[in-house]
Amino acid sequence: MDTIVTMGLVLRETRYKEADRILTILTPELGVISASAPNSLRLKSKLFSAYGLFCYSEFVLVPGRNMYTVREASVNTIFHGVSSSIEGMGLAMYLDEMAVSLSPTGTEAGKELRLLLNCLYMISRQKADLRVIKAVFELRTMSECGFLPQLACCNVCGKYDDASFYLDLQEGYLLCPDCAQKTGKPCNLDAGALYALRHICLVEDKKIFAFKISVGSLAKLSAVAEQYALTHLDKPLKSYSFLKSVLP
């Protein structure tokens, strides 16, 4: 039978029978897939480490009726540092669940995979504030999934910048302070948060974390990013409550 060779990030692992696992894997060519990993729970298995949560591995897959079967796997990267703090692990689980919820199935998901790998690397190596990583993932993921906010200017008067702005969380348009006041909308972004919002949603992938933001602006950006993402999800994320308990 023909096999498929692909890189993939393990997003979930579920024990099945005595020594098997069912894996949920995010791949660049096939999107999110389910795969059976026979005997992968046996400690003597050469493939034991390749199947772990947040392991980025090369998989040799055999297509089946309902799911793939993993024939071989070799580890590329294990994000050990993710579990070095409860806050980091909580964030990783939240990003993981959002990726499973929003990434396509049966089609290309290279952008989604690169973003998640980048964020896990940033968490693992403590390269950025966890709230920055969270906001970047939420906003960029929403943008890639068809919910890119209308960030060019005020939706009414066309003003590009000001000391504050309002982002409509449902429709994704901006209002300047004057237009927001006329409609009774309280501004939820300051200038720094708006700059970061535009940067995250519009810049090329490799520069996505190349911005600076003040503590005050980050608080506004973080709140808007979270609310915007949760507004457009089909269902609540189970990991959200735990994340908020460790990273308010």
Question: How would you label these PLM feature ranges?
Answer:
Residues 1-248:
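Non-catalytic alpha-helical scaffolds and adjoining flexible linkers that form interface surfaces
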